[in-house]
Amino acid sequence: MYLADEAEFVLLMSNRSRIPDEQLKAFVRVYRLPIVSLRRSVWVALMYLPALLYCSWLIRGILRRERCSRLQFNDFHFAHGAVLRALGYRGRIATWVRLDPLKFGTIGRLWLALARLSSDRLIAVSKYIRGRVAAPDVEIVFDPVPDVPVLMPSSEPNLVFMGSYQTIKGQKEAIEAFHRIAGKHPAARLIFYGSDLGLPGSQAYFAELQDQAKLGAGAERIEFRPIVKDPADALKSARAALCFSRSEPFGLVCQEASAYGIPMIATRSGGPEEIIEDGHTGYLVDVDDVAAMSNRMDQLLSDPELARRLGAAGPEIVRKRFRPSDYANSLRHIYDL
């Protein structure tokens, strides 16, 4: 954890989170709370306000007990900050904006307004997100690049796609593009690592993807595997990694793959454009442009040396652009440490 030797960090998280305690040892204490997220459900909508007030009251008690003078919200849709201000909390609040607020419509604008009112600092994770927030006082703090070994592209003709199964992520387009070039590359495989998150909409989309995978030239060579804890476990067998999102706030997969030395094929969907240098560390294609996706797949599957050259350029670029030391200095500035 960054700045662990300069401050003590207490983590407040949902009691529905499956993250085991052994992965949270960097925090001096961890509190699991009944944090409710607003969803398209009548019951959840009815319970949202009472749950928000109750959870905020619990948080206020923890902040007093822990004598916390600084509070970070990991995204703008946590409206607890506004309630805490009403309850008298006077500590410093910084709110990260990791999701695109415009995709939530009216409720997104309300959440963002509450975050602005209650926060001392509003932090965007990319230039793209700062533009979507459209406020001059929003700061940018890029996620730091992980310190990982360079793998370089695999000699195996595998394309890897990591991400939860959501229509916005673009797995459907990846399958369509792969089917187009599968006949030319009989040894190539398209491997998905993901999860349906236990959500009905994602489960339905996952079922559609499985059906789509069976109907094309690459039917026998499209695999769906569970999400992995360590990206290296997925990327070590990859010639290239894919990210075909329609809207991507930052693109952690793009950053991780580049750090490992794996070239990316990604859409011009926001964050990836700030990570990938087109033609130098990977390729950028337009959203939903399946023809361009399949063309870039074909190029990297046909030319292992090209994949190695693009992959080799990635680690140096992302390590300079997303230095952990810059991230740590930004946190010191935000929290006046």
State where each predicted segment sits.
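Short, structured helix-loop element that forms part of the nucleotide-activated donor/catalytic region
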Residues: 20-24, 191-219
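Carbohydrate-associated surface elements
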Residues: 128, 144
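A short, well-ordered alpha-helix in the C-terminal region of glycosyltransferases
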Residues: 292, 299, 306-320, 327-330
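Short His-centered aromatic/hydrophobic patch
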Residues: 52-55, 73-79, 97
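Conserved acidic donor-binding segment of nucleotide-sugar-dependent glycosyltransferases
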Residues: 278-279, 283-290, 299-304
